[in-house]
């Protein structure tokens, strides 16, 4: 790089975890002008001490002091509520299964946070995501992280060129074990901290209990597709396509799985057997299609896709439609595609972009996954 790194200001999103701690440490070691920012996205004052925000910020302070960088906490609660949490609840009301991580990256970490960082004179923002960016001509490509088990491009699929041109992912070329090793060698306070899992604003709390605080549950009948009533469900929002646990159906034979929802009648459909035919589909319609590059796209794209995080890729043909949606046709049937989740497109290691799964189809007929 022709410019001296000390002239380049990088604002790091620090969560109090090991990944973002090592990100800040690496950039500081490389001579960048580094500032750490802790994003406070959720108001935990009305909770019962479960949220770890204060503890996490203490860890940010400890690490920032260890590596010698300034740090701040910035409140994005309003933006998070408006852009992420409201979407989260709206999707559940529609009987779908949302992906708040995708929306958080699009609207908070690489929008509200990026704008704030720029107000501090940032040339780039950096996070602890396991993904890579690569300049090719005038464009920035988003590439999978080297650690296949940790690759997070699935959650970054909605990022635009304007956002990608401003980001650094120092951990993208590393395995998670290397990151822990660096943290230990550097003596970082978070070196042995457990990775956070699940949805950040729910934390360790019971999911059903949390959701019922915001959306009234409406119990109803649990039926087979032939109309046989097998019991009661606790509320359609608590169930997702392909779910097995928590159905409370006894008896012998193969386990039961969720195969559909009827919102109007408030009925949950279940069938027996992991490989029940209703769980398999051959295509889907996706909305909110977004691409990571500005290059012109052909109407038909042959690529691979992921329908959930850490799933192996499936060969697909994507047909872009005039209304901004896409029909995604699978080379082989896929099990338990879930409306509301992200479908993400890849060309080898390049993440092309993605969209939101809206409807799921088989042999030209729409499956009643949410209807």
From Swiss-Prot:
Name a GO CC annotation attached to this entry: cytoplasm
Q: Name one GO biological process term.
A: tRNA wobble position uridine thiolation
Q: Where is this region: Interaction with target base in tRNA?
A: 99-101
According to the record, the residues making up region (Interaction with tRNA) are 150-152, 308-309
Annotated positions binding ATP? 13-20, 39, 128
Marked site, Interaction with tRNA, at 129, 341
> E.C. number, please?
2.8.1.13
Q: Write out the catalysed reaction.
A: S-sulfanyl-L-cysteinyl-[protein] + uridine(34) in tRNA + AH2 + ATP = 2-thiouridine(34) in tRNA + L-cysteinyl-[protein] + A + AMP + diphosphate + H(+)
> Which Pfam families does its entry note?
tRNA_Me_trans, tRNA_Me_trans_C, tRNA_Me_trans_M
Question: Which CDD domains does the protein's record reference?
Answer: MnmA_TRMU-like (cd01998)
Q: Which cysteines are joined by disulfide bonds?
A: 104-200
State the Gene Ontology terms under molecular function: ATP binding; tRNA binding; tRNA-uridine 2-sulfurtransferase activity
Give the primary localization class: cytoplasm
Q: What class of enzyme is it?
A: transferase
What is known about what this protein does?
Answer: Catalyzes the 2-thiolation of uridine at the wobble position (U34) of tRNA, leading to the formation of s(2)U34.
* Protein name in UniProt: tRNA-specific 2-thiouridylase MnmA
The organism encoding this protein is Listeria monocytogenes serotype 4a (strain HCC23)
**Gene label:** mnmA
């Amino acid at each position: 790089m022709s410019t001296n790194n000390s002239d380049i200001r990088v604002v790091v999103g620090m969560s109090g975890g090991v990944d973002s701690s090592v990100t800040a440490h690496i950039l500081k070691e490389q001579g960048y002008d580094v500032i750490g920012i802790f994003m406070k996205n959720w108001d935990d004052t009305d909770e019962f001490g479960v949220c770890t925000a204060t503890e996490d910020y203490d860890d940010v302070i400890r690490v920032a002091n260890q590596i010698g960088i300034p740090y701040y906490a910035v409140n994005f609660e309003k933006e998070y509520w408006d852009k992420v949490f409201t979407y989260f609840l709206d999707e559940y009301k529609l009987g779908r299964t949302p992906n708040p991580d995708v929306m958080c990256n699009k609207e908070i970490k690489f929008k509200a946070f990026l704008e704030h960082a720029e107000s501090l004179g940032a040339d780039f923002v950096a996070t602890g995501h396991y993904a890579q960016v690569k300049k090719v001509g005038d464009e920035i490509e988003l590439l999978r992280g080297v650690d296949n088990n940790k690759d997070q491009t699935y959650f970054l699929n909605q990022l635009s060129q304007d956002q990608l041109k401003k980001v650094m992912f120092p951990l993208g070329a590393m395995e998670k074990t290397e990151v822990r090793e660096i943290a230990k060698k550097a003596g970082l306070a978070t070196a042995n901290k457990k990775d956070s899992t699940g949805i950040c604003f729910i934390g360790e709390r019971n999911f059903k209990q949390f959701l019922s605080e915001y959306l009234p549950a409406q119990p109803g009948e649990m039926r087979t597709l032939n109309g046989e009533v097998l019991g009661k469900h606790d509320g359609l929002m608590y169930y997702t396509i392909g779910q097995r646990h928590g159905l409370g159906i006894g008896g012998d034979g193969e386990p039961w799985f969720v195969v559909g929802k009827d919102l109007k009648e408030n009925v949950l459909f279940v069938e027996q057997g992991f490989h029940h035919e209703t769980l398999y589909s051959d295509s889907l319609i996706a909305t909110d299609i977004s691409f990571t590059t500005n290059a012109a796209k052909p109407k038909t794209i042959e690529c691979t896709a992921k329908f959930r995080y850490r799933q192996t890729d499936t060969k697909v043909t994507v047909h872009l439609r005039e209304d901004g949606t896409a029909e995604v046709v699978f080379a082989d049937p896929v099990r338990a595609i879930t409306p509301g989740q992200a479908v993400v497109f890849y060309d080898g290691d390049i993440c092309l972009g993605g969209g939101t799964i809206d409807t799921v189809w088989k042999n030209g007929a729409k499956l009643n996954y949410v209807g």
